[in-house]
């Protein structure tokens, strides 16, 4: 292993060097910061950025090494501060400066402290006085500590260094576009592309040999789907490419691999084969009226009735997905190939996210088409925002999700920062609420996921009885991937899942597209039919 130790003219750098030797049996190459060359960086398997005097702004090379890391990076004290500031954190005079003092087993030498940690970084340790002691990047192999692990008075420094130097993750910067990156995995049986095609977040392209239920993950985590009926189909990721919102990208693996890109397939339109609704117009209207009968009897408040469209699919699903992601950019777009089933999703809806024990759900209930002019567009958005029926639908699901998160939340932590806000997407306006909570200590990410699954926006309320009624009305036909969830879960417990809507599922040359809506006592059956036509417009009129 080749370890580069960047020396910021500190008096403890060679203590760090000998800690590396104790941890890995190799001495690092120690290079003064101003003498570091691209060759030094590119030849290193691990990079350590030492402590030093002053502030990170006085070291102009700091941001680049952290934003575009050629190998896993560990920042110590000044290096840690530089890592955090590279991603937008604030560095201030510490409320509790420490020089040669030991707290919680950590020797501290610092007058400054990091505050306002950005979402891209995850805090992993705080001192008892509230000072941030350690953090890591959520996607990149970058971490750091404010304290000095090399100090003779620090405990745990050797374990920290062994963990950092352990050969469990391979990283290499790559250049190109996500459309090119997906070709790396063109011949793989199991592929996932979690695609923030609207540019709002990170994208993940990955593969792995094993597909199964959620379990203790590899260092690269698991990516996959949960069907509405609860079947878990997750790839145990062994190779991946991670793309930042700025377009910077890195290949990662549980072992080294050589990314080989080819020209992506040309975009292909949706096949113009005949479309067939599982429940035709009269049948669907009759089922809506039956929903309202159940509601009138007091069995439910809201029933999320679904339908589906099927059609022959004599086209390359990936080529069609490339067209869909351009025409309908979405924060939760996704392409998956799982043992012969291909999923093409342009979902706009977050089901559940967990970051640092902070849970967030964003159910969608209420839809209007985008207008043909700016004036009409504003009128449609205003109509949605003031609709008694749509707000009632959304409120019921919001209260349902408050209940679901309450099963695993710290008492009193469930909040609704946004109730019935209008969010606009490429083809529709949506009514969206945001529910947050703090995960109860002792509860796991899987506990949270299962407490809220299936997403209330696809069931109605009360959930248990509504699902029984829907199973009867939908004639015991499995929804499958539609109405389920797509997302990832990391070994550290971060997760993010979307609701599977606006999604084509292709198997054996036949495509299905689920669609539906929430039925309440205020629903007009014909208007509900028109709403599913609006939601299905990209499929019915490609």
Where in this protein do the model-derived segments appear?
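Extended alpha-helical targeting/anchoring segments
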Residues: 168-542
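Extracellular ligand-binding/catalytic regions of CAZymes and related secreted enzymes
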Residues: 156-169
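Conserved strand-to-helix beginnings and helix N-cap segments that scaffold or border functional pockets
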Residues: 17, 59-62, 157-158, 317, ...
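Flexible loop residues that form catalytic
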Residues: 52, 140, 150, 308-309, ...
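Pocket-forming structural segment of enzyme catalytic cores
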Residues: 63-76, 81-159
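Charged helix-capping and loop-helix junction motifs
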Residues: 60-67, 159-161, 319, 499
